């Protein structure tokens, strides 16, 4: 066995190529097929390197591998092209680090799909709904509005949905995504236009979703869940790109918006768990070897690979139904509070993006157009202006990208760029990214103090599980502004609008 490398020896494989980008050179871990790269500025890089230093000092023992090692291990997977890429909000996760983008060549029979490259919360994502209200309109009723949202949207760990459906209804929702929401009257036709994939993955096959996953999914439809999921009332704090903002219906600083961050709940988790078990068997059968057993994968064109992609598509559709149901409930709450209609309040969806998903896309690789399976885990699609897969309204601005901050910090709307398309398979960051583990947060932070800090910022908060608040406190995360600025300065996405929270509803 090769002797363990010192921290300095490990760092010799990493090279800075710009103020915001590093390359992980081949040899950092065995069997790398392509280099790795990560986007971090001076401040964010210290977190990456501290994690690596701790790993070396501990003799390689402890929890997850450091993110930079995970990034390099992904670069060893069969069929990977370009680079294994990490965004500035990177932190270690299961198999793939959070913030990882990896693309696999669909024409390569050896190319793989890995559930660890999507994550357990399939199609966890963010939707922003605009209104024509201003901060002054909601100032006096902010507490009531927070309570109304809390009352309307089922939140918390075991929360159950109030959108009535049956087992047959769930099957339809898994197959149809937002088309189901539209048919059942929970969405507007134009909502679909402003949603990635138009809110429906056509590769979904409910027969590939286990009975256990469906059993977990049925009672949770239209629920927010816990952890870092939230519904937030925000106001526009700053406009960086007036043209893009205008296209999004963002007219002025102080305008009220609603941000919904949620995913596929227990159903998505079960789909991932089921697939990992199947894929371990497939790896043994097909002789696929990885550096880390958490990188369980299967050939894209194998039965297991296709089964996973069909089931993952169902979980993605379920998450879009969830966000659509919560949009419906938000619209109801606002309409009731302001004695109006959602239409008169101009409560249109600005855009809805996923940040845990694998999708078949076309990209240029080494000067050739290739069909790739792009895994994005804790990373958001950010297609450039004139891309055929983005709505007509955004053809001149690029695709809107919703970046949720942490509880009590600002959020952003960005737009996609051509440079991002060329360098990161049209991807950018997804949020702030954890700076300390959930366990560490629970041990070091006091929830009463966290809630008090939010109140002093003038933020109304409703929380279903107060003890979980410490895990999601701003102190547990990187600074979202640093993350967004790194992407902006690197040119892989562009800042359009900054949003500030005035009320938070959390699970």
From Swiss-Prot:
Signal peptide: none annotated. Mn(2+) 2 binds at residues 124, 261, 355. Keywords: GTP-binding, Ligase, Manganese, Metal-binding, Nucleotide-binding, tRNA processing. Catalytic component of the tRNA-splicing ligase complex. PANTHER family: RNA-SPLICING LIGASE RTCB HOMOLOG. Ligation probably proceeds through 3 nucleotidyl transfer steps, with 2',3'-cyclic phosphate termini being hydrolyzed to 3'-P termini in a step that precedes 3'-P activation with GMP. In the first nucleotidyl transfer step, RTCB reacts with GTP to form a covalent RTCB-histidine-GMP intermediate with release of PPi; in the second step, the GMP moiety is transferred to the RNA 3'-P; in the third step, the 5'-OH from the opposite RNA strand attacks the activated 3'-P to form a 3',5'-phosphodiester bond and release GMP. This is RNA-splicing ligase RtcB homolog. It comes from Micromonas pusilla (strain CCMP1545). The lineage of its organism: Eukaryota, Viridiplantae, Chlorophyta, Mamiellophyceae, Mamiellales.
């Amino acid at each position: 066995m090769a002797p363990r490398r010192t921290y300095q020896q490990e760092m010799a494989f990493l090279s800075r190529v710009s103020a915001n980008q590093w390359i992980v050179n081949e040899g950092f871990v065995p069997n790398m097929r392509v280099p790795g790269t990560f986007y971090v500025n001076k401040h964010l890089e210290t977190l990456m390197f501290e994690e690596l230093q701790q790993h070396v000092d501990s003799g390689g023992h402890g929890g997850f591998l450091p993110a930079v090692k995970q990034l390099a291990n992904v670069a060893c997977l069969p069929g990977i092209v370009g680079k294994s890429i990490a965004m500035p909000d990177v932190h270690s996760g299961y198999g793939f680090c959070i913030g990882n983008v990896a693309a696999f060549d669909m024409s390569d029979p050896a190319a793989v799909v890995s559930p660890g490259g999507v994550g357990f919360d399939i199609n966890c994502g963010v939707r922003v709904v605009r209104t024509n209200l201003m901060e002054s309109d909601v100032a006096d009723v902010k507490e009531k509005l927070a309570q109304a949202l809390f009352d309307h949207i089922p939140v918390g760990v075991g929360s159950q949905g109030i959108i009535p459906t049956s087992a047959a209804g769930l099957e339809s929702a898994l197959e149809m995504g937002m088309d189901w929401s539209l048919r059942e009257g929970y969405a507007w036709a134009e909502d679909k236009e402003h949603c990635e994939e138009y809110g429906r993955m056509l590769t979904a096959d409910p027969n590939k979703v286990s009975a256990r996953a469906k059993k977990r999914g049925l009672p949770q439809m239209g629920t927010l869940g816990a952890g870092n999921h939230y519904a937030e009332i925000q106001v526009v704090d700053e406009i960086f790109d007036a043209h893009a903002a205008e296209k999004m219906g963002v007219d002025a600083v102080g305008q009220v918006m609603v941000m919904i961050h949620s995913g596929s709940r227990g159903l998505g988790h079960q789909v991932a768990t089921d697939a990992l078990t199947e894929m371990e068997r497939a790896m043994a059968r097909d002789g696929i070897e990885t550096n880390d057993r958490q990188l369980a994968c299967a050939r894209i064109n194998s039965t297991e690979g296709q089964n996973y992609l069909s089931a993952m598509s169902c979980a993605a559709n379920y998450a879009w139904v969830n966000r659509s149901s919560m949009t419906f409930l938000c619209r109801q709450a606002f309409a009731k509070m302001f004695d109006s209609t959602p239409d008169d309040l101009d409560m249109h969806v600005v855009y809805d993006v996923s940040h845990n998903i694998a999708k078949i896309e076309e990209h240029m690789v080494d000067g050739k157009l290739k069909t790739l399976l792009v895994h994005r885990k804790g990373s958001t699609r950010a297609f450039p202006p004139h891309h055929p897969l983005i709505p007509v309204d955004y053809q001149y601005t690029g695709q809107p990208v919703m970046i949720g901050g942490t509880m009590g910090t600002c959020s952003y709307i960005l737009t996609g760029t051509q440079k991002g398309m060329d360098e990161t398979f049209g991807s950018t960051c997804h949020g702030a990214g954890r700076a300390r583990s959930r366990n560490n947060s629970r041990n070091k932070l006091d929830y009463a103090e966290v809630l008090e800090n939010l109140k002093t910022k003038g933020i109304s908060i409703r929380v279903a599980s107060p003890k979980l608040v410490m895990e999601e406190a701003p102190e547990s995360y990187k600074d979202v502004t640093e993350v967004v600025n790194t992407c902006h300065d690197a040119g892989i996405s562009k800042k359009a609008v900054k949003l500030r929270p005035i009320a938070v509803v959390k699970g």
